[in-house]
Each structure stands twice: as structure tokens, then as C-alpha cells.
């Protein structure tokens, strides 16, 4: 089993701060994107849904192209994997 690849705001890190609203209140939304041979599946559809979910919760979302680049980075390294994108309000 390989270790997970974790990016927080595009930076490799072990996780989110304990003061993050997702930890304290469960405040956030996510998308899970399957990748096959390092290629994420239907990224645009997933990002559309993520943006709708975040808007419904009034959560700030990083630039779409930036999120897509992070997804591609993780998928390329992970190969056949699941890429989970989580949006929170932050600390």
C-alpha cells in the first residue's frame, strides 16, 4: 500500500490545522475524482459540482485552473487512484 499524497493549498503537507472549520464544525465540501493511469476522469464535471456545493455553503474556492492543476499533479503521481478535493472555510 502506498502512502497518501496530501496537498493543502497546493503545498505538500501532512494535513490541515486542528483549528480548521472542517475539523471543528464539519464545515466543508468535497469531490472524489477517479484517475486511471494518471489521468483524472471527467475533471470539469467534478469541478462544476464542487463549485456548486461550495457556493451553496458560501465557501471560498481557489481558482478552477489551479485546482485542476493540483488534481493532475496528484493523479499523475498516483496512477490508478482516487483524488479527493476538499474545500473548507479555513481556520
Regions found by a protein language model. Name each.
Residues 1-91:
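Conserved alpha/beta cores of soluble small-molecule-handling proteins
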Amino acid at each position: 500500500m502506498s502512502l497518501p499524497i496530501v496537498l493543502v493549498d497546493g503545498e505538500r503537507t501532512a494535513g490541515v490545522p486542528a483549528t480548521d472549520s472542517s475539523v471543528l464544525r464539519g464545515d466543508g465540501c468535497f469531490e472524489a475524482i477517479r484517475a486511471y493511469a494518471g489521468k483524472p476522469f471527467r475533471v470539469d464535471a467534478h469541478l462544476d459540482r464542487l463549485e456548486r456545493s461550495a457556493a451553496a455553503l458560501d465557501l471560498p474556492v481557489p481558482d478552477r485552473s489551479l485546482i485542476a492543476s493540483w488534481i493532475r499533479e496528484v493523479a499523475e503521481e498516483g496512477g490508478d487512484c482516487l483524488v479527493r478535493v476538499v474545500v473548507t472555510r479555513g481556520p
